[in-house]
UniProtKB/Swiss-Prot annotation:
MF-aspect GO terms: flavin adenine dinucleotide binding; tRNA binding; tRNA dihydrouridine synthase activity
Cofactor dependence: FMN
PROSITE patterns cross-referenced by the UniProt entry: UPF0034
Family: Belongs to the Dus family.
Protein name: Probable tRNA-dihydrouridine synthase
Lineage: Bacteria, Pseudomonadati, Pseudomonadota, Alphaproteobacteria, Rickettsiales
Binding site for FMN: P17, M18, S19, Q72, K141, N202, G203, D204, G226, R227
Flavoprotein keyword on record: yes
Cystine bridges: none
Gene3D superfamilies per record: Aldolase class I, Putative flavin oxidoreducatase, domain 2
InterPro entries: Aldolase_TIM, DUS-like_FMN-bd, DUS_fam, DusB-like, tRNA-dHydroUridine_Synthase_C, tRNA_hU_synthase_CS
């Protein structure tokens, strides 16, 4: 089983950090189904240091479970990232993950995210400063490299390991690929062979077969599920069960899904308040219903609603109609 410092994961399947997706309520839901680890959405270190309202909300954690208390930080200033890491440690975080993989223009434009893979000296300073600043484990998530000519993830993983970083996750694409093409799980094997710390494979892991193939091709210690979990908070635990037993556990029934969607919707409203929560919930409701009969009409109707009670009534009506078909 994977250990990050003294923290042992219950499975080798992890929920990826995803901006505007893996907030506290979604992480709690995925963890309850049985994820080995859940990671917060990316938080800008400088915003964290000045205690912006949004950053403080993003770093909220479940305090009684170390595997629900992993916070991901982004930035390019070693001292600022280190300070943000210490702040999160003081607030109860048990693991800090460093973002070296985000391909978004607004992130790399500030020389953060995957742009850090172009400057190994700066990367080393960030690793060293953050490891030194806290007592909790530091992990890092990266891509294969910036482009096809600079696939330096194995070298960067070595630098991370020598600096005291305790786990590396690799998305099997370069920054310049964004999300086009297919994740190169074979390449991740070169990272696994370069270091002794746990290596996690990420990218395109959306079902049982792909999870098994990603592990076999990469030789990684575990896998990280990202976009495949949209509208399927149970997928991470399903994959973990499959990898352990070979059994393909079915998704929750439609009746069970109604309960899950309703619970998640209520949790979002409680956490954010109705005025903010209703718009946030729409994307999740859309993903939950995707592929079900008449889901396009349902999503269109929900997207026009602002009354929380009306939305909840529409959710119940839709899932009840699906159960009758």
């Amino acid at each position: 089983m994977i250990k990050i410092g003294d923290i042992e994961l219950s499975s080798n399947v992890i929920l990826a950090p995803m901006s505007d997706i893996t907030d506290l309520e979604f992480r709690k839901l995925v963890k309850r189904f049985g994820a080995g680890l859940v990671v917060s959405e990316m938080i800008a270190s400088r915003a964290m240091v000045v205690k912006s309202r949004q950053s403080m909300q993003k770093c909220a954690i479940v305090h009684d479970d170390p595997t629900s208390a992993c916070v991901q930080l982004a930035g390019c200033e070693p001292n600022v990232i280190a300070e943000a890491a210490k702040m999160n440690e003081d607030m109860g975080a048990k693991i800090i993950d460093l973002n070296f993989g985000c391909p978004a223009k607004k992130v790399v434009g500030g020389y953060a995210g995957s742009a850090l893979m172009r400057d190994e000296q700066l990367a080393a300073k960030i690793f060293e400063a953050t490891v030194k600043a806290v007592k909790i484990p530091i992990t890092v998530k990266m891509r294969m490299g910036w482009d096809d000519n600079t696939k330096n993830a194995p070298d960067l993983a070595k630098i991370a390991e020598s600096s005291g970083v305790q786990m590396v996750t690799v998305h099997g694409r370069t920054r310049c690929q964004f999300y086009s093409g297919n994740a190169d799980w074979d390449f991740i094997r070169s990272v696994k062979e370069a270091v002794k710390i746990p290596v996690i494979a990420n990218g395109d892991i959306t079902n049982f077969a792909k999870a098994k193939e990603a592990l076999q091709k990469s030789g990684a210690d575990g896998i990280m599920v990202g976009r495949g979990a949209y509208g399927k908070p149970w997928l991470v635990s399903q994959i973990a069960h499959y990898l352990k037993t070979g059994e393909e556990k079915p998704a929750p029934s439609i009746a069970e899904q109604l309960d899950i969607v309703t619970e998640h919707y209520n949790a979002i409203l409680d956490y954010y308040g109705e005025s903010v929560g209703v718009p946030i919930a729409r994307k999740h409701i859309g993903w939950y219903s995707s592929g079900l009969p008449s889901s396009a009409e349902f999503r269109g109707a929900v997207n026009l609603m602002n009354d929380p009670a009306e939305v909840k009534e529409k959710i119940a009506e839709f899932y009840t109609s699906v159960m009758k078909e």
